[in-house]
Amino acid sequence: MTVIATKWKNQEVRSHNGLVCSNGDIYEVHETWMTSVHETQDFGGWLNVAILAQQELYGGQYMVKCGEAAEHGSIGVVVLESLQNHQPVWTFVSDLSNPFDQIIIKGGWVLVLSTSGAVLRFGAPMRAARLLLPDTSIHASNGGRL
């Protein structure tokens, strides 16, 4: 069992802005792209997670859980858990989003909404993850037009 899986049993995730996979891969997630991070990272510590919503995905293959860091309520957390072994496939932490508290499945995508209007969008298990923040929206740079 990985360190991430062991810590998740106590609802703890790495204190790292971005997506951390159970195999050790790390990604930065942005509005229009995600990129692998190759340099050594200083993760800091671990965050305790208060789960605010959860939703089963794809007929019982996965469970997506979202919430906030108990230490600081403005930090949003999303975890994709395998229902085969109840271990995290990946964890996502954002100190720009506020807590994530709603999950919507639409058109094959998972949309996780935060209390500030931020949206984490992904296809499970990990396809094209994007983080849309309300103040950096492509619509805001386009005068609010769609």
For each predicted feature, which ranges?
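Repeated scaffold domains used in trafficking and secretory/extracellular systems
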Residues: 2-22, 44-61, 65-66, 93-107, ...
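Sequence-structural signature of mature extracellular/luminal beta-sheet repeat domains
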Residues: 34-36, 47-50, 70
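A short beta-strand motif characteristic of beta-propeller blades
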Residues: 38-46, 86-94, 128-133
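Short loop/turn segments that connect beta-strands within the blades of beta-propeller domains
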Residues: 59, 74, 106, 115-116, ...
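Conserved beta-strand element within WD40/beta-propeller blades
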Residues: 65, 112-113
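Structural motif
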Residues: 71-79, 118-121
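Alpha-helical oligomerization segments
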Residues: 115-146
